[in-house]
C-alpha cells in the first residue's frame, strides 16, 4: 500500500510540475538566421529555457515559416496566434510608435537613447491596447540611401523610385523629388533587377547585407532609424509566475541591447566589405543635413497634428528629451 501511495504522490508531483511549464511559439519578421536580429531572438529563447529551469520554453519561427504577414505580427501576438515576437513592422498596429522613425528627428545614438526613454511609457500603453506587453527591443543602424544610380546629394533622388518601409520615409523621398514605393523585403531583389525600384532606404547591416550586389551606390545620409519591438501576448505573460516574468524582462533587456550593439558593429564590417566589393560610398555633409532637418521639421508638426492631441504631446516629449 505504501508503494501505491508513493507512486501516486510522484505522479501528482510530476503532473503539477508539468502544469507550470509554459511552451510559447515565437515569430520574427526576419527570414535570415545569420542576422543579428535572429541571433538575438535565439539567445533569448535559449536563455529563457535555461534560466527558468524549463518553466518557460520558447520555440522561434523565422519569417515566412508561419502564415503571418510582416505587417500583422503585433496583431497575431495580441490575438494569441503566437505568444512572443520581434516586430519591425509594428507601425500599422501601433502608429504612435512611428514617432521614433520620423525623418531627421533623431540623428544619433545619444538622441535615440534619450528619445526612447522619454516615450517608452506611451509605447507601453499603446501596445497594451492591443493586448500586448512591450518587453523591449533593438535598433538597426541609421537608414541610408542605397541606389542603382550615382547619388552625391539629395537632389539626385529626383525622378527615381525608392523603396521605403514607412509613410514617414516616403515623405522624405517625396520631399526631394523621388517616388516612394512600399515593398516587402522578399520583393526587393527582383524589383531592383526589373527596374521597379532604383534604390532602397536601409542599413549596410540590414537589407544591404543581402541586396548589395544590386546596389552599387550608398549615400551615407542618415534619414532615420529603424527599430524592432520585442513583445508578448498579455494573457500568456500574465499567466507566468512573477519570477518568470521578471526573468523574461531582464533577458529581453540584456539581449535587446546586445543585438543593437551587434548591429552597430556589423554595420562597420558590412560597409567595409561592400566597399571592397566595389560599392561607391559617399559621405553626407553637415550643410545638407541641416537643410534636410529644416525642411522636414514642419512635417513632424503636421504629422502629429493630423493624428491628434496624444501625438502632439508625444512629439513634445521626444523633442524636449533631445533638445530639438
Report residues per predicted region:
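N-terminal secretory/targeting leader peptides
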Residues: 22-111, 127-324
Amino acid at each position: 500500500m505504501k508503494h501505491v501511495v508513493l507512486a501516486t504522490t510522484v505522479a501528482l508531483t510530476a503532473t503539477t510540475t508539468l502544469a507550470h511549464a509554459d511552451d510559447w511559439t515565437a515569430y520574427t519578421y526576419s527570414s535570415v538566421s545569420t542576422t543579428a536580429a535572429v541571433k538575438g531572438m535565439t539567445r533569448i529563447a535559449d536563455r529563457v529555457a535555461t534560466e527558468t529551469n524549463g518553466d518557460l520554453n520558447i520555440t522561434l519561427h523565422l519569417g515566412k515559416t508561419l502564415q503571418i504577414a510582416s505587417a500583422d505580427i503585433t496583431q497575431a501576438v495580441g490575438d494569441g496566434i503566437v505568444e512572443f515576437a520581434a516586430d519591425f513592422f509594428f507601425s500599422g498596429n501601433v502608429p504612435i510608435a512611428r514617432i521614433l522613425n520620423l525623418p531627421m528627428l533623431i540623428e544619433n545614438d545619444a538622441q535615440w537613447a534619450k528619445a526612447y526613454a522619454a516615450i517608452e511609457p506611451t509605447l507601453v500603453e499603446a501596445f497594451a491596447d492591443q493586448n500586448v506587453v512591450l518587453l523591449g527591443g533593438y535598433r538597426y543602424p541609421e537608414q541610408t540611401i542605397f541606389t542603382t544610380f550615382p547619388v552625391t546629394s539629395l537632389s539626385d533622388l529626383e525622378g527615381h523610385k525608392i523603396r521605403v518601409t514607412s509613410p514617414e520615409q516616403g515623405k522624405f523621398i517625396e520631399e526631394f523629388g523621388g517616388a516612394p514605393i512600399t515593398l516587402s523585403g522578399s520583393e526587393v531583389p527582383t524589383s531592383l533587377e526589373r527596374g521597379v525600384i532604383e534604390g532602397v532606404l536601409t542599413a549596410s547591416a540590414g537589407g544591404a547585407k543581402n541586396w548589395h550586389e544590386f546596389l552599387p551606390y550608398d549615400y551615407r545620409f542618415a534619414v532615420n532609424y529603424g527599430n524592432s519591438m520585442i513583445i508578448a501576448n498579455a494573457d500568456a505573460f500574465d499567466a507566468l509566475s512573477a519570477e518568470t516574468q521578471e526573468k523574461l524582462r531582464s533577458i529581453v533587456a540584456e539581449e535587446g541591447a546586445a543585438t543593437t550593439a551587434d548591429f552597430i558593429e556589423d554595420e562597420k564590417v558590412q560597409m567595409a566589405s561592400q566597399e571592397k566589393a566595389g560599392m561607391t560610398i559617399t559621405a553626407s555633409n553637415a550643410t545638407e543635413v541641416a537643410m534636410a532637418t529644416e525642411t522636414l521639421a514642419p512635417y513632424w508638426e503636421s504629422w502629429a497634428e493630423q493624428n491628434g492631441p496624444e501625438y502632439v504631446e508625444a512629439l513634445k516629449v521626444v523633442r524636449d528629451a533631445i533638445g530639438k
